[in-house]
Amino acid sequence: MEALQFSSVNRVPCTLSCTGNRRIKAAFSSAFTGGTINSASLSSSRNLSTREIWSWVKSKTVVGHGRYRRSQVRAEMFGQLTGGLEAAWSKLKGEEVLTKDNIAEPMRDIRRALLEADVSLPVVRRFVQSVSDQAVGMGVIRGVKPDQQLVKIVHDELVKLMGGEVSELQFAKSGPTVILLAGLQGVGKTTVCAKLACYLKKQGKSCMLIAGDVYRPAAIDQLVILGEQVGVPVYTAGTDVKPADIAKQGLKEAKKNNVDVVIMDTAGRLQIDKGMMDELKDVKKFLNPTEVLLVVDAMTGQEAAALVTTFNVEIGITGAILTKLDGDSRGGAALSVKEVSGKPIKLVGRGERMEDLEPFYPDRMAGRILGMGDVLSFVEKATEVMRQEDAEDLQKKIMSAKFDFNDFLKQTRAVAKMGSMTRVLGMIPGMGKVSPAQIREAEKNLLVMEAMIEVMTPEERERPELLAESPERRKRIAKDSGKTEQQVSALVAQIFQMRVKMKNLMGVMEGGSIPALSGLEDALKAEQKAPPGTARRKRKADSRKKFVESASSKPGPRGFGSGN
């Protein structure tokens, strides 16, 4: 039975529970790492446990006609670069020390991977030279293999290349903070205005938007609609007013209303021209902005770095916002902007939702490029979608084996709020190699399960035992949801398996230890014990156990958590 496809190791349920400060403690995360995830213990995700578990998962997962899939299709930004870098240090397997000779071929692979990612050629040359010099001069470190040494060097250089430290937005000490957005046409400036306001509202700041794009049809209407969507007022003055005058009037209105942050949208062009720059200079003169941010499309590659340089020379900018980082392009812009222009990337857009704008963390980005995941971002996203009280209640239900369909539905919807499944898995160490086909299948099966749960009565959701004991109830749910009785039986059986698996994993994490792989596999195969009580209760428990075992033996659809 493979009913629950949104799962990890051997169909471990993806259940989310946040406890403590910036901490995830749940079966969802432990299934991938073998223990509790927190910001300190998993700052480095290429640990032995993760690699062992991922190797085991790959050995269990069959894709296609009985064949093991050798390569994965990477659809996210940097996917091509990640694959190229992994190929580079795989050639150091078996080496005992890094030498000029044995790193020559890996360095060629790194150079090729960076160029194919559309990183600027001068940047690639400096990067490769720096990595080579450090690798050859590094002595043998006890317990660390040469390929791991190279990974560490490349990681540190990537962090340095992208700016090193996080560059945060600056705020005015008195009066409203003014942020001026600029950029070429079609990069998403108007949308970024609303996303930035949404981002700042979460920090407790009041915002106002100024519609300064008087050339593009419906640009003002678009900003007004987006402003209503995020709950932020928009100042408009029509299309017959000069942008500089709009800026002056809008700023006056913001001061009158004691607004904390003013964000102004400006017109874009298909190319950089003198008229555009002069107009921006006038707007900047009237606004005297705290931040001048250039909005750059991540898909423009190394041209993005040249664009940032040009705007900085002409009008003077304080940083860049990189949009469409969730696309499938090569992503060289993120690696080139800081090095070429000297200006940092301050924020990045990762999706179409208003919440999909976040700070740019060079160290986290380097980790994702190298396939290490991004545990800290995972923790932050999880804490955003789940309250502390809900997490504690869920943990109690898991430990008492009372996890029900209501909890399952709540958890899957909470995970959905964190973003696409591809994005969530990309944050988890070792899970970046799950293929898009497997993810699509998992998402499809989640919808199937949700449809079946939706037609259950409140009592059936709270007491899965009723469905396990009543074929008539299962038949009714199958009919009402448009699914088969086999699918309903598989889902009901899965909830009992989930109770045992999550309780075992939570118990392991409470003990603070990471079990050996064999121990983890044993925990996943644990059977539910019949509850003590009267003979009648024991017979019902035995009946449910037989139902679970019989349903589990039936084949179901494959997903990335399939053990078939």
Swiss-Prot record:
Disulfide-linked positions: none
Effect recorded for residue 537 to G/Q/K/N: Loss of binding to CAO/cpSRP43
GO cellular component, one term: chloroplast stroma
GO molecular function: 7S RNA binding; ATP hydrolysis activity; GTP binding; GTPase activity; protein domain specific binding
Main location class: plastid
A Pfam family: SRP_SPB
Binding locations of GTP: 183-190, 265-269, 323-326
Further comment: Unlike eukaryotic or prokaryotic signal recognition particle (SRP), the chloroplast SRP from higher plants lacks an SRP-RNA component. It targets both chloroplast-encoded and nucleus-encoded substrates to the thylakoid membrane, post-translationally for the nucleus-encoded proteins and co-translationally for the chloroplast-encoded proteins.
Protein's name in the database: Signal recognition particle subunit SRP54, chloroplastic
Provenance organism: Arabidopsis thaliana (Mouse-ear cress)
